[in-house]
Amino acid sequence: MQNFKELNEKIAWQKVDNLLPVIIQDAKTCEVLMLGFMNNEALEKSLESGKVVFFSRTKQRLWMKGEESGNFLNIIDLSLDCDNDTLLILANPVGPTCHTGDISCFEKISKNADFVFLARLEKLINARKNADENTSYTAKLFKSGTKRIAQKVGEEGVETALAATVKDKEELICEAADLMYHLSVLLADANLSFSDVISKLKERHKA
């Protein structure tokens, strides 16, 4: 977490009339969750608590996001933009961020973003790990055990390869979707995620 004094000195407070626009982004999915404002005190409280604290322009007071709902925004990282007049905060949200109950205040657009969909699918798959096997195919798959899940990944991998060899694009898309889904289940079964895979890809890219 950045030092308050150092960060505070960088901010162009006069330029923003002492109310700094703050963009909140999901640290895992990169989904934009909401926009709020901070004054000097709200920024300090945020850094002290590790949770996002805004200045409410309507209530004219500080308010910690989630103080009533429990849907806190836990700060992972933050950065000023190139003009030092907007702050980006990467956060781990506890529950939905929007007061309407949606995950994001920009739900109409964000839910259609490809990587956001994958991240939400991953969360849904994880939520089915301990569910009744009669409630969904995913829960039944988890109940069948690692060997069966791995077998399904192998089967879908072969079917994906076959679809590619016969140059059937539509079938390739369908089989690749099945493969990605079953791979997601296999990763979840091992308490891993696509983030772990991406980290390995990044590591190899640097080499």
UniProtKB/Swiss-Prot annotation:
Its main location: cytoplasm. Coiled coil: none annotated. In the N-terminal section; belongs to the PRA-CH family. GO terms for molecular function: ATP binding; phosphoribosyl-AMP cyclohydrolase activity; phosphoribosyl-ATP diphosphatase activity. Transmembrane segments: none annotated. The keyword Nucleotide-binding applies. One of its GO terms (cellular component) is cytoplasm. Residues 1-117 are annotated as: Phosphoribosyl-AMP cyclohydrolase. This is Histidine biosynthesis bifunctional protein HisIE. Its EC number is 3.5.4.19, 3.6.1.31. Pathway: Amino-acid biosynthesis; L-histidine biosynthesis; L-histidine from 5-phospho-alpha-D-ribose 1-diphosphate: step 2/9; Amino-acid biosynthesis; L-histidine biosynthesis; L-histidine from 5-phospho-alpha-D-ribose 1-diphosphate: step 3/9. InterPro entries: His_synth_HisIE, HisE, PRib-ATP_PPHydrolase-like, PRib_AMP_CycHydrolase_dom, PRib_AMP_CycHydrolase_sf. SUPFAM superfamilies: all-alpha NTP pyrophosphatases, HisI-like. The gene is hisI. Disulfide bonds: none annotated. Keywords: Amino-acid biosynthesis, ATP-binding, Cytoplasm, Histidine biosynthesis, Hydrolase, Multifunctional enzyme, Nucleotide-binding. Residues 118-207 are annotated as: Phosphoribosyl-ATP pyrophosphohydrolase. It holds the Pfam family PRA-CH. One of its GO terms (biological process) is L-histidine biosynthetic process. It is an enzyme of class 3 (hydrolase). It is found in: Cytoplasm. It catalyses: 1-(5-phospho-beta-D-ribosyl)-ATP + H2O = 1-(5-phospho-beta-D-ribosyl)-5'-AMP + diphosphate + H(+); 1-(5-phospho-beta-D-ribosyl)-5'-AMP + H2O = 1-(5-phospho-beta-D-ribosyl)-5-[(5-phospho-beta-D-ribosylamino)methylideneamino]imidazole-4-carboxamide.
